Amino acid sequence: AAKNYNDVIIVASQAQYKPLLDMLMEHGATSSLEERRWMAKEAFAVSSHYDSAIFNYFDAGEGSAFRCSVNSQKQLRYGENPHQKGYFYGNLEAMFDQIHGKEISYNNLLDINAAVDLIDEFDDLTFAILKHNNACGLASRTTVLDAWKDALAGDPVSAFGGVLITNGVIDKEAAEEINKIFFEVIIAPDYDVDALEILGQKKNRIILVRKEAKLPKKQLR
């Protein structure tokens, strides 16, 4: 039916019932080619998503072909550059709770992904600083404060404007030291109330609480 959109309207979802009725009532029970084409596109979106899910199930990760279909999307502030558009497909809320700051950008997401990949390599209490997807400081110590100080000592210049991540709970003492530099994003499994008050003093600073969900073992770039 979708292939015959020149003469046929296909309805792929219950959510389209009301818009379709409104359209038919407005145009005297007729539709334009442009409207039928749009409905056909929506139908193929549904069927291709279904077919991709079936293929990936039977392919079982063998990688004979890459087919990915994700319905949910989040528009980002911009893409890699300000004049470009950027979208995130998936459920970011399954990984993080954003409790403060501006919207996450495309470049923020790249750094966040690299940061999570890096910190997951460590079982000991660790603090890492990343800039442009690369670590510019990292330390494993017995306290978050000591780990932060030694990670920063690795390259205090490059840390400016970076992404910070730790696998430990950030307390007030650590937050007071961290707050002395400018950074874009900070990620931790939790924060003390006093620490949040300190780190939240900058309006645009992105503060993320990382949930227990793990990144997939297999990634395609």
Describe each model-derived feature in a short phrase:
Residues 10-11, 129:
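A structural signal for short, well-ordered beta-strand segments and their strand-loop junctions
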Residues 4-5, 16-191, 195-221:
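Active-site loops and adjacent core secondary-structure elements that bind or stabilize anionic groups
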Residues 1-5, 11:
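Active-site cavity-forming subdomains of large catalytic enzyme subunits
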